[in-house]
């Protein structure tokens, strides 16, 4: 190079805003802190450029996503960046459209000038193999999830770890006990009896903890909701007046201070004290009923508030709890409405097989917790643990036959000796459970009444009625009689009319209105069967002709009455309280009930020579499903702590089905059954393993086949948050004359690409005979002729169709760059809602000078939109001041009332009680200069973790939050590490707040090409 040329080059470089000669390092980072993604999300990719010797030049970045059969290439024009303190730094926020990328392993490479970086990523489908929920609750975290998912043990919903391994395992997630302390199951918050769920100081604190936990994994694409807490119940505490026989204060669920406060707020008068209410008078009983029916709203109110918060995390987020175990604990707040406000009814059995009806207890609790909530999904975990394969089958299948929408297993493990049984049950539930996905519970011919008024009539005494229901339920199992549990509201509002008979047992009092309604039912076409121990006169009722007393009352009680030694008494109880003894005790009751029902021409769905075969009966349109579960008693279980449970054993049984002209299909095998016919019906000789299940499907007409319509592919790249490329398919179940069988039948749907590779292998079901399904395809899927094969899983018939797919060659919507400040997509609607709802806000700024200038700009920006803002320095905002009353039960993410150290006044840390923020707040700064943002970062509630390179020099970040800074505190966040970045963040916040959207959600790349292998 001659001297003149050299001088000209040096002069030219000096004139440029940044130094092109400086060495530039380029690094790929993933703001979601993972390299495993799903096909239903925007994949965030940040490109960090840096130079230790000057600024950064503008130029073209090439981003390449290379997989096994395709390569996608994008180019972006990146700006230069001037040096600060001699160093150059820039972070550019790019995104890939996961909706348009097929599952697989890819290498992502970024190149600009002579600098490059690459990273391997994995993308998995968000479409689950089965639409039935197969649930793992209390699961481990991280790599310990390996082998638990769809291709392993078979779970597709996970309550436990929320890490990226859940995506690899193809499971949706909810977390576990987000409101619980370290996942502990508690009736009251952190087991503090002072903290009742009727108390807003308590439940708002619980919601704060639940939101902090839920927000920590909200960017996971497989997060479908937040599991909040297990076994919440209204508290019992020392009563100020009630005393035990020895004169000591008694523990009671009545007259809890927060409940009395709420009652007075509602009725403008003091709630009567429990010890002053005389239930022997009509007026006293009416007052007692009014107090306790009002009390039944507390848990429901708590869940309303919880759901309202959780659903703000992301669209469709489910608020979940465990609300079924205490179905008859009226004074603990449990009735049909206790979780009415939640989108899913979820819970577990009452300590499984260790109480009540022993082997039958898990399904008993399930069926009696279902009344009046059958229009929504039910996810149920029958027991807490297991010890044999037979026990696990029995609990799971007895619950499955009720027609619930999700079946949860206890602490399963790939290393468990029962892993094969777990997998077997999950496979059955995945294949066949699709017929139950749409809640459509069958109203059984026989109903069993659970009486609320009988419990209220006993005040604080023990009602016999609930215990008697144990024996009635077991009797119906022994007589192959499926039942529907009903409550008094079902009797009063006419719901009972959907049944042919109702059994009333063990009651000593019924509300007169209920008696009248039962009499009307009996006067019509209904049958009211009353056991002889019922002391209520119901006109028109049919006397059973025998008592239905609880086994504990009729047998165990008298046997131990003369034993004075407590340990000896307990030992005798354990000796007598076994499932074997209960079955023998209940058999006469089952026989008599069966005789009475037969007299009324109410027959079971099948007959059998082995009475320990339980029956399930579900009707879905023109298809009847008859389910049989073997609970024949085998040997005594191990370990011995599960007292009274008897291990299920094998059975050879003859089952006779009605000869009603319908064909019979083995739904577990997928073929028609040829049964022998005799005068009693169609006979099947079957071998059952312990706890085993058989399922017979009986459509109105023989199945002829499956007709598959030609699939239609639709491409619409303008779609946001949904698949831009969709394949619509429909399959119809028909009889041998090609008429639609209008029912719900299980299907297997397999979609293959032109090379024969399986793209989808799914279990779904028809609805009214038709299964309509929309599946996403990707821009880089293989072009050519695709096939769809549909198999009906009842008869094994198949149908097939094909369609043509042409992959995209150019689609800039596959990638894009953030327009201005970074924000998480699901926060957008919440930010807009904040601006529409709030009229007064506080702006809490960090210590850096640029925050104050940005805040003043924000005050000016907000004023025309009727929002008045006040600026405060975040570090000067004190902790919330608590009164004595508040401090006693104040709860939060790290607090549970005075017993946890919460004190009156301002002595508490803001991390415990929140800040004194009378208005919603907009927080400006960084975690390093703003104490509020520091707490948010510590609790991991921000969608992205801010640091020196994120959002990066000159960039800002905007986020939304609820509850972290205090009870019900709504917050918006602007984070930036310099003035330019904060200016950008405030501007973006303004745009989001007033609804000023760019024409396209992302800035498109300069070019985009897609190469797909032939």
Regions found by a protein language model. Give the residues of each.
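Edge beta-strands of extracellular beta-sandwich domains
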Residues: 116-123, 707, 711, 761-763, ...
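Solvent-exposed alpha-helical segments and adjacent loops
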Residues: 811-1014
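Carbohydrate-binding surfaces of carbohydrate-active enzymes
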Residues: 32-41, 47-48, 57-58, 102-110, ...
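Aromatic-lined substrate-binding rim segments of carbohydrate-active enzymes
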Residues: 144-213, 298, 302-311
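Polysaccharide-binding and catalytic clefts of secreted carbohydrate-active enzymes
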Residues: 194-200, 204, 209-362, 366
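The substrate-binding groove and active-site-proximal loops of carbohydrate-active enzymes
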Residues: 132-141, 187-207, 283-300, 325, ...
């Amino acid at each position: 190079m001659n001297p003149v040329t050299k001088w000209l080059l040096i002069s030219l470089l000096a004139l440029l805003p940044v130094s092109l000669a400086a060495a530039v390092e380029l690094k790929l980072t993933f703001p979601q802190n993972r390299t495993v993604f799903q096909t239903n999300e925007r994949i965030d990719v940040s490109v960090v450029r840096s130079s230790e010797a000057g600024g950064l030049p503008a130029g073209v970045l090439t981003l390449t996503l290379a997989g096994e059969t395709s390569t996608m290439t994008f180019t972006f024009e990146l700006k230069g960046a001037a040096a600060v303190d001699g160093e150059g730094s820039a972070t550019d926020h790019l995104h890939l459209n996961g909706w348009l990328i097929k599952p697989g392993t890819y290498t992502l490479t970024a190149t600009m000038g002579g600098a490059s970086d690459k990273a391997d990523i994995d993308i998995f489908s968000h479409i689950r193999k089965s639409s039935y929920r197969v649930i793992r609750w209390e699961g481990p975290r991280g790599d310990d999830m390996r082998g638990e998912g769809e291709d392993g043990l078979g779970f597709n919903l996970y309550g436990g770890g929320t890490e990226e391994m859940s995506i690899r395992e193809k499971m949706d997630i909810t977390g576990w006990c987000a409101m619980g302390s370290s996942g502990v199951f508690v009736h009251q918050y952190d087991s503090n009896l002072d903290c009742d769920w009727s108390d807003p100081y308590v439940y708002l604190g619980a919601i704060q903890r639940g939101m902090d936990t839920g927000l920590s994994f909200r960017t996971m694409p497989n997060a479908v909701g937040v599991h909040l807490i297990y076994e919440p119940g209204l508290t019992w505490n020392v009563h100020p007046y009630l005393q035990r026989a020895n004169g000591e204060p008694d523990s009671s669920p009545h007259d809890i201070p927060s409940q009395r406060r709420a009652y007075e707020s509602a009725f403008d008068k003091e709630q009567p004290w429990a010890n002053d209410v005389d239930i022997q008078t009509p007026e006293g009983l009416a007052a007692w009923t009014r107090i306790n029916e009002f009390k039944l709203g507390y848990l429901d109110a708590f869940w309303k508030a919880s759901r309202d918060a959780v659903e703000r995390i992301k669209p469709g987020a489910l608020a979940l709890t465990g609300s079924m175990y205490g179905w008859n604990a009226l004074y603990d707040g449990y009735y049909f409405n206790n979780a009415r406000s939640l989108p899913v009814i979820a819970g577990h059995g009452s300590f499984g097989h260790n109480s009540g009806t022993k082997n039958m207890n898990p399904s008993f609790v399930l069926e009696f917790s279902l009344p009046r909530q059958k229009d929504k999904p039910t996810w149920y975990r029958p027991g807490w643990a297991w010890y044999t394969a037979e026990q696990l089958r029995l609990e799971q299948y007895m619950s499955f036959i009720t027609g619930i929408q999700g079946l949860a297993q206890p602490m399963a493990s790939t290393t468990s000796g029962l892993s094969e049984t777990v997998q077997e049950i999950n496979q059955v539930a995945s294949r066949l459970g699709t017929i139950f996905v749409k809640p459509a519970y069958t109203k059984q011919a026989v109903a069993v009444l659970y009486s609320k008024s009988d419990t209220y009539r006993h005040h604080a005494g023990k009602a016999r009625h609930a215990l008697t229901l144990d024996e009635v339920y077991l009797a119906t199992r022994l007589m192959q009689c499926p039942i529907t549990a009903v409550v008094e509201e079902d009797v009063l509002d006419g719901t009972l009319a959907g049944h042919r008979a109702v059994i009333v047992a063990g009651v000593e009092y019924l509300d007169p209105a209920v008696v009248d309604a039962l009499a009307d039912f009996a006067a019509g076409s209904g049958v009211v069967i009353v056991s002889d121990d019922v002391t209520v006169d119901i006109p028109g009722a049919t006397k059973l002709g025998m008592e239905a007393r609880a086994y504990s009352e009729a047998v165990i009680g008298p046997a131990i009455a003369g034993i004075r030694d407590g340990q000896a008494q307990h030992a005798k109880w354990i000796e007598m309280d076994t499932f074997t003894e209960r079955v023998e005790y209940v058999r006469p009751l089952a026989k008599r009930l069966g005789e009475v029902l037969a007299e009324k021409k109410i027959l079971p769905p099948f007959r059998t020579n082995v009475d320990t075969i339980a029956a399930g009966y579900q009707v879905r349109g023109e298809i009847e499903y008859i389910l049989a579960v073997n609970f024949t008693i085998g040997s005594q279980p191990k370990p011995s702590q599960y007292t009274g449970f008897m291990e299920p054993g094998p059975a050879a049984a003859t089952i006779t089905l009605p000869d009603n002209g319908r064909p019979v299909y083995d739904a577990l095998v997928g073929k028609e059954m040829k049964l022998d016919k005799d005068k009693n019906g169609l006979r099947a000789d079957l071998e059952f393993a312990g706890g085993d299940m058989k399922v017979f499907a009986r459509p109105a007409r023989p199945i002829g086949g499956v007709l598959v319509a030609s699939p239609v592919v639709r491409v619409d790249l303008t779609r946001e948050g949904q698949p831009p490329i969709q394949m619509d398919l429909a399959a119809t179940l028909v009889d041998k004359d090609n008429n639609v069988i209008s029912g719900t039948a299980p299907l297997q749907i397999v979609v293959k690409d032109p090379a024969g590779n399986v793209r989808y292998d799914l279990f779904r079901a028809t609805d009214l005979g038709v299964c309509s399904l929309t599946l996403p395809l990707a821009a880089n899927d293989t072009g050519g002729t695709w096939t769809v094969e549909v198999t009906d899983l009842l008869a094994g018939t198949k149908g097939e169709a094909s369609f043509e797919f042409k992959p995209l060659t150019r689609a800039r919507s596959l990638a894009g760059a953030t327009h201005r400040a970074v924000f998480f997509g699901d926060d957008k609607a919440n930010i807009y809602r904040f601006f529409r709802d709030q009229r007064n806000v506080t702006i809490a700024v960090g210590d850096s000078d640029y925050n104050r200038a940005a805040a003043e700009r924000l005050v000016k920006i907000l004023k025309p939109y009727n929002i008045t803002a006040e600026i405060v320095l975040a570090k000067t905002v004190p902790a919330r001041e608590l009164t004595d009353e508040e401090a006693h039960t104040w709860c939060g993410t790290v607090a549970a009332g005075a017993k946890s150290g919460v004190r009156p006044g301002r002595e508490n840390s803001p991390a415990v009680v929140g800040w004194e923020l009378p208005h919603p707040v907009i927080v400006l700064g960084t975690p390093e200069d703003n104490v509020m943002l520091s707490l948010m970062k510590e609790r991991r509630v921000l969608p992205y973790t801010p640091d020196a390179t994120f959002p990066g020099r000159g960039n800002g970040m905007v986020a939304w939050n609820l509850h972290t800074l205090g009870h019900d505190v709504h917050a918006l966040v602007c984070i930036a590490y310099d003035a330019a970045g904060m200016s950008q963040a405030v501007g973006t916040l303004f745009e989001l707040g007033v609804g000023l959207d760019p024409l396209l959600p992302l800035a498109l790349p300069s070019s985009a090409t897609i190469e797909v292998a032939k």
